[in-house]
């Protein structure tokens, strides 16, 4: 074949792979997780005060590299579709990442998949690919009838040493790591070890009708769902997704959780700073129509705690300037932006009265500045009326920073669903303060 003809034919195939089947259909992200790398803790400034209490013991070191192994990663999607594509991430890899094979299937239970649902993924028509360091790779679209709120198994085989693998720490779903070998097509992975993190996987898109769209939930651990019950989907974004799916007027709307536990706005924490990852984790997703921003409490807590160096101090203006940048970027892409107030934190390890003053001022800005298209008042939904600095007793977890399952439900239930579409008469939808 003429070389030029061959190139044009390959381009035509690639273009065909990229297009939804109908002109009115489009790609919408139904599930996502923000990629991150394990970062070393920054050194303590020489002029910082000594801590008044011993530091908490370090968590166990988690395996973060793989060699000749299969990862079966279990995720819970939101809206369904008849075609899908998968995003794999080597964002924080130190070298090119070889993917030997990858499959997607509906999960049955444990590491087992539903018979007949397994599909091999391809990348530009090939069963394997190499992802450059710092990059992502999107699979070719494939046909798979994906119901709403599906448990999906994405299996990825890495034939060689990965080095430190890009991951998302707070997965809150049990996933499986094989012994040596390619088990991507296996109905079940026997003798697998388990993890509550997701490795190498950052998103799933579906082909959906023209009116389908996604809400991006952008934040820190309180958005990530930290301390909620694992394998039950009880983060506030998951619970919001359940409310939307249960309502015929909003069942076409996906909710994508792009929170990172320990994330910060002004500087890197767990994961790069919120502003640094904003384009990738919000603007780079498919079918985004709405954005919820709930982030700043880690900046307040870490920078204003008693042991922080004076040079670390921040003001509410520092925070709002960065949030304003996110709002402007989102609006330039036609995305509506909802601001969420910060939930109480008195009693948390990094609580301070100065920090509480900044939290209150930040919440007042969210409520009254007019910067947002609407406000989700999570503070009002969860605070103790007799002591607004802390959670209501029934929502309070042991660390006084994260709500329990009931608290996350209160947050999700406080959201006015009419912001996303007309509601059936008589249906309670929650509220949105302005």
Where are the regions a protein language model picked out?
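Bacterial N-terminal signal peptides that target proteins for export
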Residues: 1-7
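N-terminal secretory targeting modules
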Residues: 17-218, 228-231, 249, 420-434
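Structural recognition of the beta-strand scaffold that forms the well-ordered cores
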Residues: 85, 214-219, 223, 253-259, ...
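Solvent-exposed loop/turn segments at secondary-structure junctions
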Residues: 92, 160-161, 221-225, 260-265, ...
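Glycine- and acidic-residue-enriched helix-capping/strand-helix junction motifs
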Residues: 225-238
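Oxyanion-hole/transition-state-stabilizing segment in secreted/luminal serine hydrolases
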Residues: 228, 260-317
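Catalytic His-Asp segment of secreted/periplasmic serine-dependent ester chemistry enzymes
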Residues: 275, 301-303, 342-434
């Amino acid at each position: 074949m003429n070389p030029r003809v061959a190139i044009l034919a390959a381009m035509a195939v690639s273009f065909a792979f990229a297009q939804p089947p109908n002109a009115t259909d489009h790609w919408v992200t139904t599930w996502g997780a923000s990629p991150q790398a394990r970062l070393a803790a920054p050194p303590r400034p020489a002029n910082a005060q000594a801590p008044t209490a011993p530091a908490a013991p370090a968590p166990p070191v988690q395996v973060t590299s793989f060699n000749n192994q299969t990862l079966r990663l279990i995720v819970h999607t939101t809206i369904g579709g008849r075609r899908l594509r998968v995003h794999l991430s080597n964002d924080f890899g130190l070298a090119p990442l070889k993917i030997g094979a990858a499959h997607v299937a509906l999960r049955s239970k444990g590491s087992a998949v539903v018979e007949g649902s397994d599909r091999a993924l391809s990348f530009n028509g090939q069963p394997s690919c190499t992802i450059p360091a710092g990059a992502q790779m999107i699979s070719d679209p494939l046909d798979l009838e994906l119901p709403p709120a599906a448990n999906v198994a994405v299996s990825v085989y890495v034939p060689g040493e990965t080095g430190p693998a890009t991951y998302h720490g707070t997965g809150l779903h049990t996933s499986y790591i094989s012994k040596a070998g390619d088990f991507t097509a296996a109905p079940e992975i026997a003798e697998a070890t388990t993890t509550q993190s997701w490795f190498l996987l950052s998103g799933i898109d579906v082909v959906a009708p023209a009116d389908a769209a996604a809400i991006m939930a952008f934040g820190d651990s309180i958005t990530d769902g930290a301390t909620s019950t694992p394998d039950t989907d009880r983060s506030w974004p998951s619970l919001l997704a359940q409310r939307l799916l249960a309502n015929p007027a909003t069942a076409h709307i996906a909710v994508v959780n792009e929170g990172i536990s320990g994330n910060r706005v002004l500087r890197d924490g767990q994961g790069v700073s919120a502003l640094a990852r904003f384009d990738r984790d919000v603007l780079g997703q498919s079918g985004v129509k709405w954005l919820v921003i709930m982030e700043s409490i880690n900046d307040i807590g870490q920078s204003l705690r008693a042991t922080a160096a004076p040079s670390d101090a921040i003001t509410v203006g520092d925070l709002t300037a960065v949030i304003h940048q996110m709002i402007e970027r989102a609006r330039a892409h036609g995305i509506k932006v909802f601001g969420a107030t910060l939930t109480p934190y008195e009693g948390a390890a990094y609580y301070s009265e100065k920090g509480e003053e900044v939290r209150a001022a930040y919440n007042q800005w969210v409520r009254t500045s007019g910067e947002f298209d609407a406000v989700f008042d999570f503070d009002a939904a969860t605070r103790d009326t007799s002591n607004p600095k802390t959670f209501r007793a029934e929502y309070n977890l042991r660390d006084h920073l994260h709500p329990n399952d009931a608290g996350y439900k209160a947050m999700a239930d406080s959201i006015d669903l009419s912001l996303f579409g007309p509601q059936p008469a008589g249906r309670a939808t929650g509220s949105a303060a302005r």
